[in-house]
Amino acid sequence: MIRAVIFDMDGTLIDTEKYYRIFWPKALEAYGYTMTDEQALTMRSLGRPFAPRQLKDWYGEEFDYYAVRKKRKELMEEALDRDGIKCKPGAVELLEDLKKRHITTAVATATDLERTEKYLTLTGIRPYFEKLISATMVAEGKPSPDIYLYACGQLGLAPEECMAVEDSPNGVLSAYRAGCKVVMVPDQTQPDGELKKCLYACVPTLAEISHLI
């Protein structure tokens, strides 16, 4: 029986994942590096220590991950301030349905807690969530299972009692490794054959999830 639904945030609840795809390459360009679109997609929801390691593998040990990440955050914040932040289709309807059914909801995101609070508040959906879990709270980010195991612990539930909703491969792997029932709502890319083995379901929008619970 599913007693809670744990959501990824960027690209799942709110339409922000595309900005990571745009602004990782732009931040790298500012420091004299080139990042392909395929590499940018690899970075989605990739937490520490994996993100710094991946970039150093590509660009060398001297690569200043924290400086480039700071630049990416600045560029992304400028774009979000300019364009605004929107919920993904079906988000509010799903959250309202889960609330009526007394199913607990939480967020497990690679984004830091301050920006998580900001984005969810700006989109008007912050009140729906009992817990907000940031990757900064655990030793290893996605695709390690730490963040989902921690989220389940904070909710007082076993992983098998929790459904995880994710849009990216790294997020799916994190939730699957934790033992959650994983539903993917693809944002930037579709799941390949190997990733599909980790999924309970793959649906086009959040609106399709209610009937799975």
Residue positions per predicted region:
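Conserved SAM-binding loop
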Residues: 13, 87, 105, 140, ...
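Bulky hydrophobic/aromatic packing residues
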Residues: 17, 104-105, 192, 210
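Residue-level detector of anion-binding/catalytic polar loops
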Residues: 34, 104, 181
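Structural motif
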Residues: 43, 108-110, 165
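Conserved G/P- and acidic residue-centered "switch" motifs that form tight phosphate/ATP-binding loops
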Residues: 8, 12, 109, 167
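Hydrophobic residues in well-ordered beta-strands that form the structural core
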Residues: 15, 107-109, 184
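N-terminal helical cap/lid subdomain that shapes the substrate entry/recognition surface
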Residues: 2-101, 114, 126
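Asp-based, Mg2+/Mn2+-dependent phosphohydrolase catalytic module
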Residues: 1-3, 96-99, 112-213
